[in-house]
Amino acid sequence: MADVEVPINVITEINNLNELNNVNTGNEASGGISRWLIYTIIVLVVAAVVGLVIFIVKKVNNKKRESGQIIQEVSQVLTENVDKKVANDLLDVALRARTEQAQLEANSATSVQLAAVGKISQSDADMAIKSAADAKIKAEQANIEAAKAIENIRKQELDNANKAVAMATTAAAAISATYQDKSKDIIDNKLREAEETYKQVVQQRQLAEKEYNASLATRRQAERNVYNKKVTEANETIKSVKKTEDVLKVLDDKIKQAKKATDDFKKKKQADKNKPPASKPSPGPKPAPKPSPGPKPAPKPSPGPKPSPGPSACPQFQTRDSKGQCVCDPRQGVTWDGKSCVCDMKNGWNWDGKKCVKGACPQFQTRDSKGQCVCDPKQGVTWDGKGCVCDMKNGWNWDGKKCVKSGGGGGGGNVSGTITLMSNEETAVLNKGTYPGQGGKRYNRQWNVPGNMSDSCLLEFDIFFPSNFWFGCQGKIGGFFLSRPGQRGVASGCAKPGKRTGASYRVMWGGTTYKNGKRVGRDGSGVYPYLYFDDSTNSKQIPKLKQVEDCGHSIMVEEFSRSIKRNAWNNIKIGLKLNTIGQRNGLIYFEVNGQKQTQDQVMWTSSSDFNIKYVIFGTFYGGCTGQNINQIPNTFVKYKNVKISKWSP
């Protein structure tokens, strides 16, 4: 609500009553003046309340006439100004009239009192009273006229406000009508645009449906074509398969007939097809005939074998030809098979245990009731599908001459089920040039390790080194080979990482000597373990066992650098125990002439099917280069009493 100004007009002159006024404002008794002052304040408060009530009533009336946001805003501004002016005018008139009336009444009362005390005359008092009454009448009349004037102004301002409101309402209505017209035009335009867009969408949809239907028809036709083609191809394939099955059936019948004929032929010609029992038991030693238990002859079929070093006489089953060279004697039924002299089985010669004889059954065979040569079970021999071999399943093993029943014995721990692989002496000739790649000969023997020894095995043998044996160049003797089923396993020949599919533990000779842990020369005469680990386990070995060079890894070299006796038999035992999968708890056992040493923390295998498969004696010089190769003399080593046992360390 707007502030209300309340001016107070003080009448200083009333018909030269200055003295009266001075008396009223002096220091005389003021009891009457105080009373009139209270009246004046009350009148002012009443006037303020009346003005406020008028203002509130006006506000309520104005609100009742408001009919919209625009009208309300205009009316509010105009009404506030009019109300403020009317209130101020009414209060001014009322206050002035009341003030003058109060002053006159006060003057009249004062005059009466003064006249009573003789200060003024009674006539002067009456005159003052009359002047006050006239002034009161004049003031009231002025108030009435002012009120009328103010009322007229109020009516005029209200009329103006109403006109402004009407104009504003008209303008707002016009604007609203214009907006509605424009909105209608815009809506019409948008509707027309929407209708055009809809028509275009409908046309595009119809076109898309048409294209889709055409594509669908094309796809269905293509599918029918492909289906028909596949059906045709399938029918052709069925016919082809049927035809192939017919051909295979015919071939199968022919194969069965051929197999039956082959079996019949083998039974009839078994004597000619059976190989003589070789000294290799594979899977037990094959009982092949050996013409001489001594050093192997070294004849060559063309131009003829050179006479082997040693005695001047030719070995057994050999004779000198016209050039003075020892060759296989065909008169004794002996021929050269590329490695040695053997019975000429192609021409009906067979080994009878002592010599090649014409028409006799091969060694370890006997004639059955039909007169055919068959494997003799009384001699512990059985047929393995290729030839007669020792019946290892029933405890028969090859001792170098015949199949014998296995016995006990051994060393290097608790052993059981000892198998003698070779009891007789055999000589490994190491003539000059035996070094690999340089020609000459190398000694090779191989035996299978039975299943009960495939996880822990002890190999024992005796070896003879002559007095002139040269240890200056290292060489291999033999030992264990490990692999997976059906695999030979690569664990020799300087196999590089990534190609080592097997493992091996062989004995190696060498002349390396040490002093205070340092290598000082090659004048020793020792043997030591020589190892290859497969790719899956080498990286998991302890540092002293890890193979860092391609050509194997040697251990215990210093300890056994002078372990061999020259010109005497030496006993060697090597033991190998597999580790538990995932653990380094395998063993290496090495013993020479009673000197023993064991290496633990070995990881031989990372798979349950990787185990000990063979004992192989591959004897040759291999471990020197340059001029040392030319220093290899014509020499030899001898073996005997080769045995394997189940080892329980």
Curated annotation (Swiss-Prot):
Residues 184-268 form a coiled coil. It is found in: Membrane; Virion. GO terms for cellular component: membrane; virion component. During viral entry, involved in the degradation of the host cell wall at the site of attachment. Residues 258-275 have a biased composition (Basic and acidic residues). Residues 407-649 are annotated as: Catalytic. GO terms for molecular function: lyase activity. The lineage of its organism: Viruses, Varidnaviria, Bamfordvirae, Nucleocytoviricota, Megaviricetes. This is Exolysin. Residues 278-312 have a biased composition (Pro residues). Keywords: Coiled coil, Degradation of host cell envelope components during virus entry, Lyase, Membrane, Transmembrane, Transmembrane helix, Virion, Virus entry into host cell. GO terms for biological process: symbiont entry into host cell via disruption of host cell envelope. It comes from the Viruses. InterPro entries: Exolysin_DUF5874 (IPR043659), Polysacc_lyase_14 (IPR048958). Pfam families: DUF5874, Polysacc_lyase_14. The chain crosses the membrane at residues 37-57. Inhibited by Mn(2+), Cu(2+), Co(2+), Fe(2+), Zn(2+), Ni(2+), EDTA and EGTA. PANTHER family: DISAGGREGATASE RELATED REPEAT PROTEIN, PTHR40124. Its cofactor is Ca(2+); Mg(2+). The C-terminus displays the cell wall degrading activity. It comes from Paramecium bursaria Chlorella virus 1 (PBCV-1). Its EC number is 4.2.2.-. It is a single-pass membrane protein. Residues 258-325 are annotated as: Disordered.
